[in-house]
Amino acid sequence: DFLKKNNLNNNNILSIFIPNSYNVYWDTSPEDFRDKMLNEFNKFWDKDRSEKAKELGLSKFEVISLASIVQIESRKIDERPRVAGLYLNRLRDNMRLQADPTVIYTIKEYYKNFDTIIRRVLYRDLKLDSKFNTYKIKGLPPGPITMPDISAIDAVLNFEKHNYLFMVANPSNKGYHLFASDLSGHNRNKRAYIRWINSKGIYR
């Protein structure tokens, strides 16, 4: 069995598909394509990347799960190492990740509609039961919530060292976040964000 032989399961199988350019013949069988992707995955995880994952105390699959959250959290490539560092700080401190992208994934999974656009996470959403909802579970979800690109994976492996534990979208710098190392600082940032999102009439 391919999954068992390669320590894969239905939750983490997407991890072996590293977004990149590949040469594939039009008549390649699904099995040959799958095997090629696994081979490319193993090549991607060279000595340098493998050692960095080991230093983090994470498996390759866990790195990719975290990278998938980082990618959805920040579309800004230059901010991703900072976001990755924040999540790694929370894991180190045994805190729940409380990552909104996992809640959005949970909502879409719950309603079986992955095409819906969710611009605002509501408090009731945080209570949805799912092994992917990092407000409910401790640690990482059992697999990626998207196929992270190479920049997101490398952002985790080359994370920024800092003391941040909290973040919220920055209303005055679109696409970026405001970071805080304590709850009081985060609450100030959060109040500013809530005022902004309410002023835009965004309620879902």
Language-model features: locations:
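Bacterial extracytoplasmic/cell-wall-associated proteins, especially those involved in peptidoglycan
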Residues: 2-204
